[in-house]
């Protein structure tokens, strides 16, 4: 899309599960593990499974010139996330290639990758691809009115956004597990249960310098469609 210039910055939070050859999540070989709670950003062999694969992927992406800004163990055992930053359409290019590299690295370790938004039913978090974004005005001349107006614009086309944000997302966006219901749209400051989270840093910066986090995209979403929807909506 020609409107997507390097003025637009994107940070994708790609979540996924490492899987065994039988399709079960890594670390679930003896059946369902204890309830989630200790796994998020966890340490220790009883709390984490697959760190060496995640770190090999990080190293490979950095060597390829892809700007990963971090990785972390996620809420469920065997679930991971990495953050991929880029400017303009290159953000989607890099996210797409980073996924390819992830599958290749995982293959070398004899495991698979599952980017379905809800691979395990029950009281387990799904996998999303929260999309953080900003443009020049948001970073240098923001205001509470500006950020609220942007959220309202995205809310007006919520159905179109959901259509662009990946398949089977209804299984993840239930209103539970740090999500808003797929049927509803909301935004709020530091609200992990909202469709759009307004970072507390925006408030701390007196709204002059900030960004927004769209929490609706699924882990299997097409990053080009996400960018096209966000920029297309906010530049109308």
Where do the model's predicted regions map?
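Glycine-rich, acidic/polar active-site loops that bind/position phosphate-bearing ligands
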Residues: 1-236
